[in-house]
Amino acid sequence: VAAISAGGAGAVFWMWVTAIIGSSTAFIEATLAQLYKEKDPLYGGYRGGPAYYIHAYVEEKQKKKRNKVVISVLFAISGLLCWCGISQVISNSVVSSFKNAFSIPPIYMTVVLVAVAAVIVLRKDATVKILDMVVPVMAVCYFVITILIIVMNLGSLPGVFARIFEEAFGFRQAAAGGFGAVLMNGIKRGLFSNEAGSGSAPCAAAAAECDQPVKAGLVQALGGFVGTTVVCSRTAFIMLLAPEEKVTGLSGMDLLQTAMEHHLGRFGVIFIAATLFLFSFSTFLGILFYARCNVAYLFGDNWASQIAYKVLALVMLFIGGLAAYTFVWDLGDVGIGLMTIFNIIILYPQGEKALKELKEYEKEKRK
């Protein structure tokens, strides 16, 4: 949604390119996260991610133990900034969708969203069990509905692909100085959707129970690719299959819900609002999961810092519900850009280890 809002149809193509190229970086960073994971004394299980494998790499190069490594610290701070920004995006999307569907004032919906999120975060056992049951059902419903819409409009699909490729390389965008915006927004939103190279996903990959580090890498490479090329593409097609005169000038949830209203009537608007509301909590929990290992790296193993970040994330959730659509992306864009820079710096020299693990894994498979 954000890619098309800011960069038009051509941004979808660059999201695909990001997904294809990003699969290799996703494999390397997830494998490294498994190689350098460590026990988590607070939550149990394992933790890890770029802050940890960067730290290990510097210690190996300098051949001495370090309490903190500058690049690891910078990555962890950038990650926390990014995830605070994503918290704003979550609430902004939900609040906008409910305003469109039910005319609920943003302040009321923001308060409800933050209150429910606080219950889930601070006392989550029962609510998480409910989400575990409901969210997969909604995901299947969204998948089926979007596929049905695409099938119903199969005749228009070639025109959509033509528009995507034309605007990705079009002379019109280049002449208007818009090609850079198309490319930039496609890559930025591609990074948010597949996370490849940014260092977010390895925080989760480190916690996985794997007998071979490579397995986490392969799963991550496939997951990021499918997430962008299949899941995000379906949403893009829904918007691009709507008549241009109906969606011109719209952005964010206004764009998506107007497109859904064209395809499914009022039901489409309400369906998007309900789906986003449920998905927002699982996404928010995912963000906090990513954040906790970086908070631990920065401030040590203590509950005070963990709770403080959760409270900060709830505050950002509140701010995002009331802020302008373009504003809420800014903090996330800055954070993910810095994360990617610090992560890629280390992925290049460390990539050999991941590739070595892959070769050994392939040898075992051939036996």
Where are the regions that the model predicts?
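Helix-loop-helix module between adjacent transmembrane segments
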Residues: T18-Y46, H55-N92, S96-I120, A274-L285, ...
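Membrane-interface loop-to-helix entry segments
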Residues: I71, F75, G79, N92-F98, ...
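Membrane-interface alpha-helices at helix entry/exit sites of multi-pass transporters
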Residues: G8-W16, A56, E60-V73, T110, ...
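Selective recognition of specific alpha-helical transmembrane segments in multi-pass small-molecule
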Residues: I21-E29, M109-K124, V135-G155, K188-L191, ...
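Extracellular loop-to-transmembrane helix junctions
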Residues: I4-G44, V226-R234, D333-I346
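Flexible loop linkers connecting adjacent transmembrane helices
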Residues: A2-A3, G7-A11, A26-R66, E245-L264, ...
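Extracellular/periplasmic helix-exit of transmembrane alpha-helices
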Residues: E29-L35, P41, I147-R163, G177, ...
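Transmembrane helix-loop junctions in multi-pass membrane proteins
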Residues: A9, W83-V95, A117-I130, L148-V160, ...
